[in-house]
Amino acid sequence: MKKVLLIILLLLVVLGIAAGVGVWKVRHLADSKLLIKEETIFTLKPGTGRLALGEQLYADKIINRPRVFQWLLRIEPDLSHFKAGTYRFTPQMTVREMLKLLESGKEAQFPLRLVEGMRLSDYLKQLREAPYIKHTLSDDKYATVAQALELENPEWIEGWFWPDTWMYTANTTDVALLKRAHKKMVKAVDSAWEGRADGLPYKDKNQLVTMASIIEKETAVASERDKVASVFINRLRIGMRLQTDPTVIYGMGERYNGKLSRADLETPTAYNTYTITGLPPGAIATPGADSLKAAAHPAKTPYLYFVADGKGGHTFNTNLASHNKSVQDYLKVLKEKNAQ
């Protein structure tokens, strides 16, 4: 009888030690860092159970003890509630923190930078190449985009997307992102339109955006934008053609090869401001906040001309003779730079 009791006692001790070791392993796993060496994007599909999750984490080399992982989920059931989604794991994260993240449903955010001065066609290309975007547009035609966005004025599309870094989660649609950018631009344009200076020669908000887009393409110097705007406003008021190269480039479309010839300037298009009077029918790029502000509040100047000064800025003039001299000065600066 004593031997039996001794054996039972020994078994209980062994089981106790084993249980203690098991619990230690579970706690150790819970507080250990993930095996990854860099940020890792992990997608948990809907309906994934505890076993499947452990196998996926092990297969992706995120954890190394799938069986102990299952013990952890049983011992701490609060950690076994996870939501489908795409998550970002970091090397500093523990297994417990990872499970808490999966429980929270806080999915990874991805950035999409829409830069001012670019066209909608550039943004559509970015969307096609961006990771984890759900593509729903049938093609990249502007008419298709306008229809998908249900625009009240389908022709008001180029230049009508707010340039910013837009954050999104996996499976966000291309249309959803474009709607966000469009909504913010509409709000900004409405504000600029309501607060615009008196007497500006714009027929509607689209002309304001069109002017802002031309300013955006003409100068990258924020402090000059209202002055550049004044040149174009002064020209519009006296019926003088705008004669701005970026409009020619836009009107040429895919024919533009990086260089403009005199023939290009003389070839009529709807956007060629060397051959048309007034503003083109729409924007030629996406304006930023500074250009939109300049279009709504141009400086009051007598200037009708401007040309690059070769130093990053522009020289402004009131008459053609002075302008031509400034052009020659600019060409001289370019020649000296090329000779170096």
From Swiss-Prot:
Residue intervals passing through the bilayer: 4-24
Topology class, membrane: Single-pass membrane protein
A GO cellular component entry from the record: outer membrane-bounded periplasmic space
Deletion consequences: Inactivation leads to a significant increase in glycan strand length in the mature peptidoglycan matrix. Deletion mutant shows impaired membrane invagination and cytokinesis, and reduced sensitivity to ampicillin. Inactivation of the gene can restore growth to a strain with a lethal deficit in aPBP activity and a strain defective in the activity of the elongation system, which utilizes a SEDS/bPBP synthase.
Pfam family, one: YceG
Periplasmic side: 25-340
Catalytic activity field: a peptidoglycan chain = a peptidoglycan chain with N-acetyl-1,6-anhydromuramyl-[peptide] at the reducing end + a peptidoglycan chain with N-acetylglucosamine at the non-reducing end
GO MF assignments: lytic endotransglycosylase activity
Topological domains annotated Cytoplasmic: 1-3
Keyword tags: Cell inner membrane, Cell membrane, Cell wall biogenesis/degradation, Lyase, Membrane, Transmembrane, Transmembrane helix
Annotated InterPro entries: MLTG-like
EC number(s) per entry: 4.2.2.29
Subunit structure: Homodimer. Interacts with PBP1b.
Family recorded in the similarity comment: Belongs to the transglycosylase MltG family.
Function: Functions as a peptidoglycan terminase that cleaves nascent peptidoglycan strands endolytically to terminate their elongation. Required for normal glycan strand length distribution. May function as a terminase for both classes of peptidoglycan (PG) synthases (aPBP and SEDS-bPBP synthases) by cleaving PG chains as they are being actively synthesized.
Protein name per Swiss-Prot or TrEMBL: Endolytic murein transglycosylase
Source organism of this protein record: Escherichia coli (strain K12)
